């Protein structure tokens, strides 16, 4: 028969011995690491721990439902507030999401960030707030344009000033050198649209006045000649544009003046351009046409053509 009393007695007899064993194990556990680390090693470890700096990371997409809601065009709540020019609401949203770079730099279906839209809608104050909150000025839209490209294309000097003065020097250098998917820098776009104030401002900030677009190798000065803009030509020359820089086909800005109405541009460039870059190169087709005065014996035209049973007279 099973006797509970007997087992209780056995447990009582073994109790003190087990308690002593447990006490020894605890003592061993506490003392096992004693003197395992020297003082100098400990001090070095403390020093290294103090020098650890956590790297800032982009905040993950927040769990708030309004942050995750998108339209069919991929616009977030912030995109829509900027599009509809709800400035008070926009500033409130920016204040709430400050530091959430994933949300601030979110791109819609046209790859436009809120900063792109602030420039497109001509809201430089909103653009400044977005930049201070952490928006990236180097992100590109579906045409490869940064927000500064758009500001130069639209001729908005206020937006250009905000974008160039609020961003960091590293961002500014990168944006000034960046080309869109047509190969145009911000300076090219400002030149194409004839915004002289923006051109001068960009060059002052360090934009390369002799940068060549990749399609034909034209500089801003070549573009100014193409557009027949004498004031832009004068400004670019004042800013140090190279009059002897040639396109990929070998044409100087002066050579592009031939056959064009502005004699003022031709006079401006003619005084500075090398002599060998002033005359147009002769076309190979024209040379071959001029030297070919008569047909050779093997190249005489046919004189026995028959069409519909009738002899043709050439």
UniProtKB/Swiss-Prot annotation:
Q: Which GO terms describe its cellular component?
A: cytoplasm; cytosol; I-kappaB/NF-kappaB complex; nucleus; protein-containing complex
Q: List residues of cross-link (Glycyl lysine isopeptide (Lys-Gly) (interchain with G-Cter in ubiquitin)).
A: 21-22
The domain of life for this entry's organism is Eukaryota
Q: Which residues form the signal peptide?
A: none
Among Pfam families, the record links this protein to: Ank_2, Ank_5
Inducers of expression: During liver regeneration.
- Supply the name of the protein: NF-kappa-B inhibitor alpha
**Gene name per UniProt:** Nfkbia
């Amino acid at each position: 028969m099973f006797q509970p009393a007997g087992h209780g007695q056995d447990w009582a007899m073994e109790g003190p011995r087990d308690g002593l064993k447990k006490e020894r194990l605890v003592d061993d556990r506490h003392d096992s690491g004693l003197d395992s680390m020297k003082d100098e090693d400990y001090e070095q470890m403390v020093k290294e721990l103090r020098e650890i700096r956590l790297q800032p990371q982009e905040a993950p997409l927040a769990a708030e439902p309004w942050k995750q809601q998108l339209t069919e065009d991929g616009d977030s709540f912030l995109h829509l507030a900027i599009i509809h020019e709800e400035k008070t609401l926009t500033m409130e949203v920016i204040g709430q999401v400050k530091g959430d770079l994933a949300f601030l730099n979110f791109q819609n279906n046209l790859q436009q960030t809120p900063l792109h839209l602030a420039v497109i809608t001509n809201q430089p104050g909103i653009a400044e707030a977005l930049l201070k909150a952490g928006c990236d000025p180097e992100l590109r839209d579906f045409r490869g344009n940064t927000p500064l490209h758009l500001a130069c294309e639209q001729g908005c000097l206020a937006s250009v000033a905000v974008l160039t003065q609020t961003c960091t020097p590293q961002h500014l250098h990168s944006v000034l050198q960046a080309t869109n998917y047509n190969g145009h820098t911000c300076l090219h776009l400002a030149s194409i649209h004839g915004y002289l104030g923006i051109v001068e401002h960009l060059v002052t900030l360090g934009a390369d006045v002799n940068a060549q677009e990749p399609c034909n190798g034209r500089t801003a000065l070549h573009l100014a000649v193409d557009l027949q803009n004498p004031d832009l030509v004068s400004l670019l020359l004042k800013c140090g544009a190279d009059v002897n820089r040639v396109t990929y086909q070998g044409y100087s800005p002066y050579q592009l003046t031939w056959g064009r109405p502005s004699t003022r541009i031709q006079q401006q460039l003619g005084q500075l351009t090398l002599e060998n870059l002033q005359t147009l190169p002769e076309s190979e087709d024209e040379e071959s046409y001029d030297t070919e005065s008569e047909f050779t014996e093997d190249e005489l035209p046919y004189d026995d053509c028959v069409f519909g049973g009738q002899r043709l007279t050439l």
